Each structure stands twice: as C-alpha cells, then as structure tokens.
C-alpha cells in the first residue's frame, strides 16, 4: 500500500488478508463513494470502524484501504467463523459507521474455506 495526498493508504488486491481455513469466513470487495460527500462521511468514520472491528474477539484480519481511485476503497476481512461474522454484523448495524455510510454502495463477497464464494448479505 502507498500513502496518497490525503495521507491514507491505498489498497492493492487483498491487502494481505490470508485465505480462510477451517471454519473461517472472509469478506472481500469494495466500497464505492459516489461523490465527495460520501467520501468525507467514510473518511470521518473509517478509522474508528476499523479499530472497533479489529478489537472484536472473532476478527482475525480487517482492512479498509483507499485504492488508486480516491472514491473506491478495498475491503478485506477475516473472521474466526460464521458466528464471529454475525457478531460483527450485529455490532456494526447500530454503529455510527453504519449510520454515516449506509448510502454508500458496497460490492462485498463472502469466501468460505472450501473456496465457495457467495454474495455477502
């Protein structure tokens, strides 16, 4: 990753996320801001969201990083199991991150250890 003019780090590919093994579940994808307003909402909340997510007991890897396009952010997550992912979703559902970024489109897929890929919901 490289720092951009706004001093954030840009993501390339999987941001170093390990492949899931056993019962682990990974999420991979992008958040695409439509305009500077959405970008500012994301920038305001992303650091706290990443820190809170990384502090969750079932979180093994969590990265949201800006790509070369300042409006597009790479998302890579890895959780111990499906229950840990559900706990993460429950926490974020009522978070300031969710409130501030709910209108920003996400293209996220769920990756199981067996290589199955399904749309994340």
Where are the model-predicted features located?
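Glycine-rich beta-strand-turn "strand-cap" elements at beta-sheet edges
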Residues: 2-25, 64-71, 97-121
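Short, surface-exposed ligand-recognition loops at beta-strand->loop->(often short) alpha-helix junctions
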Residues: 32-42
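An amphipathic, aromatic/His-enriched active-site/gating alpha helix that lines ligand/cofactor pockets
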Residues: 52-60, 78-112
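Histidine-centered active-site/metal-ligand motif
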Residues: 8-13, 49, 88, 93
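Short, well-ordered beta-strand segments in beta-rich or mixed alpha/beta enzyme
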Residues: 25-32, 63-91
């Amino acid at each position: 990753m490289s720092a951009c003019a706004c001093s954030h780090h840009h993501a390339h590919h999987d941001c170093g996320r390990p492949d899931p093994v056993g019962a682990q579940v990974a999420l991979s994808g992008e958040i695409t801001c439509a305009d500077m307003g959405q970008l500012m909402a994301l920038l305001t909340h992303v650091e706290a969201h990443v820190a809170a997510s990384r502090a969750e007991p079932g979180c093994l890897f969590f990265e949201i990083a800006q790509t070369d396009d300042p409006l597009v952010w790479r998302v890579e997550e890895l959780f111990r199991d499906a229950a840990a992912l559900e706990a993460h979703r429950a926490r974020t559902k009522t978070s300031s991150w969710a409130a501030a970024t709910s209108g920003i489109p996400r293209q996220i897929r769920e990756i199981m250890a067996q290589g199955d890929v399904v749309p994340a919901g």
